[in-house]
């Protein structure tokens, strides 16, 4: 009978994730916002900060780099941080200027559709919102593409007023959508040219 040989046991590792860049703290240096990550980690956990960014840890990593490479890495990190800050600022500006468009279009003489555009820019999952509208109004509701290639929610029926009210009340999937950035549009169906009587 062979006896059970115990080899090296594996230890389960629980990584500490950064709330700024969502990477494990060891990889924050490769993310776009190193200084924010450092400040957050120093606030949250001093021991982890010392392990990752302390003098000993930095000296062991930088010890193998030449002075030129070290300066280049610092310059690249500063560039990345500026770029990430500009990108975040541009997104915030775009979000601020974007309007939520609620269109009412005519399908037939008495049937209408309501189209909602630009909800995804405010962090709304369009499929969840479409399902919420279908349940609320007991009608068909789906996500479809516009001719411009953007996604919109199409709801069967004239429910524009109710949707505006749901956005104001921040119901379900519509949490975080600003009620002051709503634009209502009425799209009339083009009438076919009548043929002259002979």
From Swiss-Prot:
Localisation: Cytoplasm
Transmembrane segments annotated in the record for this chain: none
All residue ranges annotated as the SUI1 domain in the record: 100-171
InterPro entries: DENR/SUI1_TIF (IPR050318), DENR_C (IPR046447), DENR_eukaryotes (IPR005873), DENR_N (IPR048517), SUI1 (IPR001950), SUI1_dom_sf (IPR036877)
Source superkingdom: Eukaryota
GO MF assignments: mRNA binding; translation initiation factor activity
PROSITE patterns recorded: SUI1
GO biological process terms on file: formation of translation preinitiation complex; nuclear-transcribed mRNA catabolic process, nonsense-mediated decay; ribosome disassembly; translation reinitiation
Keywords per UniProt: Cytoplasm, Ribonucleoprotein, Ribosomal protein
Gene Ontology CC: one annotated term: cytoplasm
Protein's UniProt keywords contain Ribosomal protein: yes
Location, primary (coarse class): cytoplasm
One Pfam family recorded for the sequence: SUI1
The keyword Membrane appears for this protein: no
Family: Belongs to the DENR family.
Description of how the protein assembles with itself and partners: Interacts with the 40S ribosomal subunit.
This protein's domain notes: The SUI1 domain may be involved in RNA binding.
Name of the protein in its database record: Translation machinery-associated protein 22
Protein's organism: Cryptococcus neoformans var. neoformans serotype D (strain B-3501A) (Filobasidiella neoformans)
Upper lineage: Eukaryota, Fungi, Dikarya, Basidiomycota, Agaricomycotina
Gene label: TMA22
